[in-house]
Amino acid sequence: MDNQVVLAEDKKYYPTAEEVYGPGVETLVNDEDEQPLEQPIIKPVRNIKFEVGVKDSSTYVSSQFLVGLMSNPSLVRNVALVGHLQHGKTVFMDMLVEQTHHMPTFDINSEKHVRYTDTRIDEQERRISIKAVPMSLVLEDSNSKSYLCNIMDTPGHVNFSDEMTAALRLADGAVLIVDAAEGVMVNTERAIRHAIQEQLPIVVVINKVDRLITELKLPPKDAYHKLRHTIEVINNHISAVSSTAGNVKVIDPAAGNVCFAGATAGWSFTLQSFARLYLKLHGIPFEADKFATRLWGDMYYHPEDRTIKKKPPASGAERTFVQFVLEPLYKIYSQVIGEHKKSVEATLAEFGVTLPNSAYKLNVRPLLRMALSQVFGSASGFTDMLVKHIPSAKDAAARKVDHTYTGPKDSIVYQAMVDCDPAGPLMVNVTKLYPKSDCSSFDAFGRVISGKIMTGQSVKVLGEGYSPEDEEDMTVKEVTKLWVYQARYRLPVSMAPPGSWVLIEGVDASIMKTATLCNVNYNEEDIYIFRSLQFNTLPVVKTATEPLNPSELPKMVEGLRKISKSYPLAITKVEESGEHTILGTGELYLDSIMKDLRELYSEVEVKVADPVVSFCETVVESSSMKCFAETPNKKNKITMIAEPLEKGLAEDIENGIVSIDWNRKALGDFFKTKYDWDLLAARSIWAFGPDKQGPNILLDDTLPTEVDKGLLGAVKDSIVQGFQWGAREGPLCDEPIRNVKFKIVDARIAPEPLHRGSGQIIPTARRVAYSAFLMATPRLMEPVYYVEIQTPIDCLTAIYTVLSRRRGHVTADVPQPGTPAYIVKAFLPVIESFGFETDLRYHTQGQAFSLSVFDHWAIVPGDPP
């Protein structure tokens, strides 16, 4: 046998796998790659550098103390810093961070701002905030009592007002920051309106008071009038809005809800904290609060009998605010800027402050910062204002839950949320998603309303489409980590009690915009969701995108999904033609989205089409004839007419002033009293379209003598669905219908249920709505921007020219009080606005600055072809 000839292919050179590994091991032989070529065998760790982190983040109080304060909701204040672009929200936040953190990054000699809450690199480069970023700071009031202040720094640019909406939903109060020199601007106005719509109290910080001294060089008396004028304008806006939306306190420095600040120099005070400063320095034996009330308004100091009266003394004197507050402030500024060491020393000595000799060698700004922060101390006046005028997380819970929860008020869950009960069922309202460092997934940021959320806990994630009847939009996820989000670093916690803001890992997969988290095993009653965010603007600018390399389409689609999560108001959709479109609020918003899409979320080269705008379809007359349509089986016939809605009604429906969920009597009374409808029409409203807050109405205008109401009622849902489908995409160019009232004037419905199925009725209802619409002189509507332009007076004619060339028109040009600038207010069609800002800067040599925000819809001139 040994001499047997063995063929080459049968020769055995190596032992078999079974001989090597033994009979207990299964061996598989693959002769082909399981893994695609473009996928690496060992994945590299992706870490995209898009955020500014911080290694050393030690605070003056221990993190255990901060976490301990979270458990006492009556010591927690949740606020959002809101206001106009470049009014100093982020720098004001810097001042608070500097007072609570040991920060090597805060260099007293540096003249640059850290902008601590501008965590993204592009925010630092553009020098504006793009995302709302929260911080939880332990601040002390004037009695050295500690409070946990959860503060959200929001963007001031009108394009990013969706971030402000998300922040206000989580907050219990709004801190309105206003530039002392510029006063109330477009976004200040919108922030006031938005805060009042969210039923939040407002306190004001008048920031950049130093601009009145150093830039505008106003005398103290004029500075007082400028500040007073700003406060009056704010109050006018508050009273104008709150007359329709509930009661909000007016702003009054004497009441303590105004704080004056110069955040760049690190100082802030309220009249109350300034009064305490005087009491401490001079040992005056009366209450600080009483003195503070006399430091504002037409009050004068009489030195002969040391009293403060409304009547000025015979010798003449300035008002108390000018004499006691502004003059010392002016004195410090003028002497430090004048670099006269002796007089600075003498003035600071009056405030009980002595600086080391080395301090006087500093540049002007660092010296100002050092002197003023020592004179005014920490921001205890600001904390006092928050404590006194903004309710604690516990006290605010009832108003917050009433405004945001969609469920019934007599439930156990509702009561637990109102009581801020840590032992109650878990309810968390998530309104923001923040990307992880590799941008592959997101962490959800929300507010715990009741119960406690813990790491390792399984929760139900209820999306915006969830209801107890339709549970499709619900998933179960495990909470893997929890943090207190501190802008540039995160504080890990194992549990978050009610009233606190928390960043949650592990639940983001099914969340698109907002969500409600609740216990998995809570079965005692139905859980309802928190209302989705109600934005104060619309995404009307759209652009189409496609990948440069068509094979990378799946990557781009995944990136678009992440964009939709990251930007609260961005809408991404696929058109019938197959192109992917993104809708945003303006050019800067879309620019920011495209940067994120290319660099963070899809990492592919993307081609972008020229921006266009969304249109709406409407009618301007009643239908010229009754329009009918028969169902395909010829057994049903529906007749309709269309006519325009009354002026202002569409806005009322969209703003939630009237709701289809009201009972028929309340709904009827509203339309009867406000819009003069007759009782029959007012009581026969079937639906708003294309959704519950849609600007179109469907009415049943049939008479019981002519139509069988029982049969019509049987197909009501199908007709409503057909109407809403039609209203979502109109007959002219598939854009939503707006401002149209559809009336059913006749209907012949088959008595047998078999012949009146939804498959027959829905398309027919849509067809008849279309024909009624087309018979009523249809028109297109385009979105129109409200534009606010800041400019010197000599550029006015150039601005008028640029606007008129783009179909815009000026509604007002008014001088900005106390400054050499003018404010031009104008309307500009959005489709004409692309490149407007560049054009404006070119024609005014860069002196004019404009901001545009969606205002209303207007009919496009001309008849659509």
Predicted features, each with a name:
Residues 90-91, 374-388, 392, 498-520:
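Structured, non-catalytic alpha/beta "coupling" segments that mediate domain-domain communication
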Residues 142-143, 168, 173-252:
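Conserved C-terminal guanine-recognition region of P-loop GTPase G domains, centered on the G4
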Residues 237-441, 572:
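C-terminal-of-GTPase-core extension/linker across diverse P-loop GTPases
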